[in-house]
Amino acid sequence: MSSVPIRTNFSLKGSSKLVSEFFEYAVNSILFQRGIYPAEDFKVVRKYGLNMLVSVDEEVKTYIRKIVSQLHKWMFAKKIQKLILVITSKCSGEDLERWQFNVEMVDTADQFQNIGNKEDELRVQKEIQALIRQITATVTFLPQLEEQCTFNVLVYADKDSEVPTDWVDSDPRILRDAEQVQLRSFSTSMHKIDCQVAYRVNP
């Protein structure tokens, strides 16, 4: 009887790790594609069958990994709702883009159906590939960021979640006069992730 909760936790742990890791690569990809940091601040790594660009800047790496580490804990505890990356003008302080990743627990009667299933692993990888490619392709319709920008990451977690002491509350950072585009999604045996980007038409 003890094997059931062990398998459930393994499935949740594996899915939480996969989704948290995806966020790390997705954030890096957005920072590169949107020119938040110069191209020489990134290196190419192979992930999801794709050439991915990740920051080599120690401060950026530390910031992202700290968030991803906390995300993984909240994912495993089933307390995470969404992750948001906001791109802000350094000059005006105006928020210009808002990337939102919604996290939904998959409600399935058989949580063990796809555990260890190679075909399902390939399906998840293909879905992630498609989403990463779509994030890359957003440069074809997103307005060019003419000014220097910075970024912040917001995390929506349940109210009873234990929050790191150096994290602070934030407003939702909803963009005014914005267009919104729904991007692709991917799902594991435990989580479904969908993505959308909002951007200022006339910043």
Curated annotation (Swiss-Prot):
InterPro entries in the record, alphabetically? HORMA_dom, HORMA_dom_sf, Mad2-like
Q: Which GO terms describe its cellular component?
A: chromatin; cytoplasm; kinetochore; mitotic checkpoint complex; mitotic spindle microtubule; mitotic spindle pole body; nuclear periphery; nucleoplasm
- Disrupted gene: phenotype observed: Simultaneous disruption of nucleoporin alm1 results in a growth defect.
**Domain called HORMA: residue spans:** 13-197
Pfam family, any one: HORMA
Asked if the Swiss-Prot or TrEMBL record annotates the protein with the keyword Membrane, the reply is no
One record GO biological process = negative regulation of mitotic metaphase/anaphase transition
Its chief place of residence is nucleus
Q: Origin, by domain of life?
A: Eukaryota
- In the UniProt record, does the keyword Cell cycle occur? yes
**Subcellular location as annotated:** Nucleus
Q: Which GO terms describe its molecular function?
A: anaphase-promoting complex binding
Q: Which Gene3D superfamilies match?
A: HORMA domain
The alphabetized UniProt keywords are: Cell cycle, Cell division, Mitosis, Nucleus
- Please report which protein family the annotation says this sequence is part of: Belongs to the MAD2 family.
Query: How does this chain assemble?
Result: Interacts with mad3 and slp1.
Q: What does this protein do?
A: Feedback control that prevents cells with incompletely assembled spindles from leaving mitosis. It interacts with the anaphase promoting complex/cyclosome (APC/C) thereby inhibiting APC/C-dependent proteolysis, a step required for exit from mitosis.
Q: Can you say what this protein is called?
A: Mitotic spindle checkpoint component mad2
Q: Which organism is it from?
A: Schizosaccharomyces pombe (strain 972 / ATCC 24843)
